[in-house]
Amino acid sequence: SKKPTVSKNSCGYNLFGLADGLSRGVFDLPKLFVGSEGTLGVVSEATLRLVPKPQGTLTALIHFRRLEEVGEAVPHLLSLRPSALEVMDANTLNLIGRSAHGIPADAAATLLAELDSSEGEGDLRERADQMAAICGRYQLCGDLTIAYDKEQRDQLWKARKALYPTLYRFDPRKKPINFVDDVVVPATRISELIRYLETFFEGQHVPVAIFGHIGNGNAHITPLLDVNDRQDFDKMVRAYHEIHGAVLSRFDGSICGEHGDGRVRAEYVRKMFGEELYQLFVQVKQTLDPANVMNPGIKISETPFTEHIDYQRLSKSCATCAKCNSVCPVYDVFQSEDMSSRGWFEIVTAKDYSYLDSKRVVEACLNCKSCRTICPAGVDVSELILQRRAENPNQGSRWLFALQAKLPIFEAILTLSAKTQSWWDRPVPRAILERLAAPVMKRIATT
């Protein structure tokens, strides 16, 4: 009776899958280990079954005027066997910027659908017509946007993929916080869940982005909070208990569909499955890991989630999406996290940062600003590195890097130098310049 009825669940241990295998005479150990989050053991070797790549793929962007109609359309769209069915609610569209992504002002929700085919484009176009017929029954903000080639499909996915890191731009103090981020309800009730969540957070005066895999009834809920502020902290705790409680009692859902329990949701595993089944989980854990050395405190724990909060980390501006790494010329050469924009951000903002310990990586940045250009959160890693370089223990280097960090002044000096370059290149001025600069450059070069 405690078996989750939703389409996917990663809460607790999958004893139901294990039992199903035993009923067929198969001890399906992967069913138990997959989703156990490293708490039961380590898989040292695995055989994977590969599936062929689809011959064709289409992506469709659909804007609905009414949120409730999205939920009504889902069962019909699922008959087309979509490989992806993503939803973004009105709040989310507002937060990421409608105009930046061409989203109509009157869209209550946007649906992103993707279909794969092993039979080629003809099959895809036929199913695209079926999709248009299904969506034509509802109030849409214009026609469906359908793309077949990769470049156009990537453009349609752009808003969805940039969604989470873009939320970091919203407020310098309030950041997207994940603590009720993975609930699952029956797919037919996803619109009802979204409406409930919008009403709840509106009452709390908390901005929130709600998006997720609507075909599975899986919602990713991301409130924007400053957990170092007492009022926001209290709102987070209240939302944690009220939303998880409502998902279990009102929606007959699961507290996590794919992200796992971890430490954040561990205290709710007992509430979801009941005492008898929870004690069975405990027995499984104790049997396979009697010394409790495999990820202790994960899944099986009574510790409140607030005990595990890294307050400093949650106040940082980086979303760790690694888009910056894709354009970083240093990372392109070294292919190492400590030689990348994302890695540098973690290094220079660490509590135990030391210039001498980090000198090699801090001075590797070319300050090309590519990271700032592509970052959805607007983080300028190169600027942070310039500030750290100005802390160089060598006085000469510190002065030079401090000057470089003051971009308007530094750029003015470079402009003046460029204009007088032809004069300094003459033999006599050049010799004087080299004689004056040599002691300074030697002192800097020793660092």
Region spans (language model):
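Noncatalytic alpha-helical scaffold of FAD-dependent oxidoreductases
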Residues: 1-257, 261-303, 307-322, 327-331
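Active-site-adjacent beta-strand anchor residues
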Residues: 63, 338, 374
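Non-catalytic, well-ordered alpha-helical scaffold segments
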Residues: 71, 107-110, 342-346, 359, ...
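Ferredoxin-like iron-sulfur electron-transfer modules
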Residues: 302-320, 348-367
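Cys/His-rich metal-chelating microdomains
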Residues: 321-327, 331-334, 368-374, 378
